[in-house]
Amino acid sequence: MAKRDYYEVLGVGKNASDDEIKKAYRKLAMKHHPDRNPDNKEAEEKFKEVKEAYEMLSDPEKKAAYDQYGHAGVDPNMAGGFGGGGFGGGGFAEAFGDIFGDIFGQAAGGGRRGGGPQAYRGADLRYSMEISLEQAAHGHEAQIRVPHWDDCEHCHGNGAEPGSSVETCPTCNGVGQVRVSQGFFTMQQTCPKCHGSGKFIPKPCTKCHGQGKLKSQKTLEVKIPAGIDEGMRIRSSGNGEPGINGGPPGDLYVEVHIKQHPVFERDGDDLHCQMPISFATAALGGDIEVPTLGGRASFPVPEGTQAGKTFRLRGKGIKGVRSGYPGDLYVHVNVETPVKLTEAQKDILRQFDRSVHEGGSRHSPQEQSWLDKVKSFFS
């Protein structure tokens, strides 16, 4: 099935700002998150689709490639495999650089220049980490296990079985490239025998199979800054896959996801919570205590507070990871109707209700207004 347009997936226009893209992602990610939709395959697929779209459109290099070439610019499995849009391969420009390099004397877009095997940067790695809202607000240090490549001790990293040697590739004479004529064009392609290394190993190492490296695991310390938000990434330079032909290693990107909180819902640097209050407190007013990520806080509820009233506690949100300023806490009060009343309590409420209605609109202005509208509707 053809992939949907990334902008369409997030529901934004092609000229959407970074903030608009991020806001759309956060809203959809929370809607389709597996934690909120257990055993829902459709929601899981939508979450993956939204996540992929955000990964592409939040990265300037990938976004530029996608805007120019569509999915072919960022998907190595499309359009003949024009690299990974900045992750692994050299991308669209490098592919055409190999084709026209012989004509123009250099590879387009900063590709290979001159003879010798071409060095490639290693692919980037991604690690998904889930943390609590408290850890996101206050910062967190964690240890993670990630893939690591060590030089093979058996062959000391050269890829050849001990007692044998690494030879110059006979097909490309150590250049790593071969020339192929097609009509009027002479194209340079990666050597099919040595895969661009310029070397040939007659007897590959029996431990690493000629790779010179063995995959293992290593522990990394990850420092998550206070205020980090859903979907943000932390880069660890040089901890990706090793480079090819002496190229630099890729980077490791730790993508942070925040668990759903039982009390708070996050909106940027602001927090929202639903606070039930008693009928008496709503009518008479009083001080109520609410939880915050920094402890407890209290604020006055005025008498006559209606259900759905929102109170703003400034500075009780999350300190922004970029701005350094704390957001606010919005408390949405819900007036709770008492249940399982005794007969004595019911009698008191009936007496109270009669006294309120005797006062008319003075005590229940909203009810009286609604009744007036109903009367005018039927008159």
Swiss-Prot record:
Quaternary structure and interacting proteins, as annotated: Homodimer.
Cofactor(s) annotated in UniProt: Zn(2+)
Domain notes per entry: The J domain is necessary and sufficient to stimulate DnaK ATPase activity. Zinc center 1 plays an important role in the autonomous, DnaK-independent chaperone activity of DnaJ. Zinc center 2 is essential for interaction with DnaK and for DnaJ activity.
Any one annotated GO CC term: cytoplasm
Pfam families: DnaJ, DnaJ_C, DnaJ_CXXCXGXG
Name of protein: Chaperone protein DnaJ
Keywords: Chaperone, Cytoplasm, DNA replication, Metal-binding, Repeat, Stress response, Zinc, Zinc-finger
Signal peptide limits: none
UniProt subcellular location: Cytoplasm
PROSITE patterns cross-referenced by the UniProt entry: DNAJ_1 (PS00636), DNAJ_2 (PS50076), ZF_CR (PS51188)
Cross-referenced InterPro entries: DnaJ, DnaJ_C, DnaJ_domain, DnaJ_domain_CS, HSP40/DnaJ_pept-bd, HSP_DnaJ_Cys-rich_dom, HSP_DnaJ_Cys-rich_dom_sf, J_dom_sf
